[in-house]
Amino acid sequence: MARILIATDAWHPQINGVVRTLDMTARMLRRLGHTVEVVEPSLYPAVPVPFYPEIRISLPRPGRVYDRVRRFRPDSVHISTEGPIGLLVRRYCRLRGWRFSTSYHTRFPEYLWRLARFPEGLTYWFLRWFHGHSCPLMVATPSLENELKSRGFRAPLRRWSRGVDLSVFHPRTKPLDTYPRPVLLYVGRISHEKNIEDFLRLPTAGTKVVVGDGPARAELTRKYPKVVFLGYRQGQELGEVYSAADLFVFPSKTDTFGIVVIEALASGLPVAAYPATGPIDTITHEKLGALDDDLGRAVEQAQRTGDPAACAAEGQTYTWENCTQQFLRNLVPVSVRSTPHG
């Protein structure tokens, strides 16, 4: 069994796809008998991100991070994020001559441009540098792999998909008296970079339901009083919300995968989305939903052609066990000649 160190700037209590992916992967690795150390923000002092105060970024002293890595004596190192913790663990590996893997979870260039007008080109330059010595760089989808190649990323790319907890996300009998039908559902961060208003402004029948929180929630609650904002939901409570809906709408154009899409499928919900990275790799035929540059048309088509049984069957193919096996196959020993714990 291996000693695996995962470095991440995203961890609990944040609620997002990156944290869910890393948390489930660490759980599965431990279940398989591996020893896992997660170097994460709660271990160090942190400050809120200026334009996104609900997210805190850690500011660790380098020596504290280096000591933690050295004491753990990893067989493999995976660096999951490009923030201060990721940078320090990357630097430690480079100083030691260790090999390491990384992963590309978040479209920071697009987000930073949208939130702070920071030039995309500069952020992509930084990301090419950060991942330049990865062996390999893990990506979730074929379309993201092709995009990173086209943007000049030179590290070897390997696939690392995502999973669904099928004990939580599965079809249930729909309640009869929830909201006027059809119920159109969005689950995710309530922020402008998620393009959520493209969903909220659609002139659809029935009820729009939003699960999640974020910096734009107060503004959008006032602007769209007919929309039901439920706040955060987790676990079985979230699974029940999915299965009570009729259609899942995913308006984001900047996600790298969209775990919520496969959670919706596993719950028996067709998906309406833009033909963007993530949905374009997942919604592969009309029974699963519809993709269109006009989100309203995608909603109409998904309501016509979506098949809940086909959606549930497709969602069941995304398991965390399979994802974790992919992750394990992609890991590299810190040194070609290293012996365990040496």
Predicted feature residues:
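Short alpha-helical donor nucleotide-sugar binding micro-motif in glycosyltransferases
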Residues: H131, R233, E240-A245, F327
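Conserved donor-binding/catalytic core segment of Leloir-type glycosyltransferases
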Residues: L176-V209
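Aromatic "clamp/platform" in nucleotide-sugar-dependent glycosyltransferases that forms part
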Residues: K253
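Short hydrophobic beta-strand element within catalytic cores of glycosyltransferases
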Residues: A266, P270-A273
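Donor nucleotide-sugar binding/catalytic pocket of nucleotide-sugar-dependent glycosyltransferases
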Residues: Y124-R172
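Nucleotide-activated donor-binding/catalytic signature segment of Leloir-type glycosyltransferases, i.e.
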Residues: A218-Q236
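Nucleotide-sugar donor phosphate/pyrophosphate-binding loop at the beta->alpha transition
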Residues: R99-S101, E110-W129
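A charged, aromatic-enriched C-terminal amphipathic alpha-helix characteristic of glycosyltransferases
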Residues: T305-R337, H341
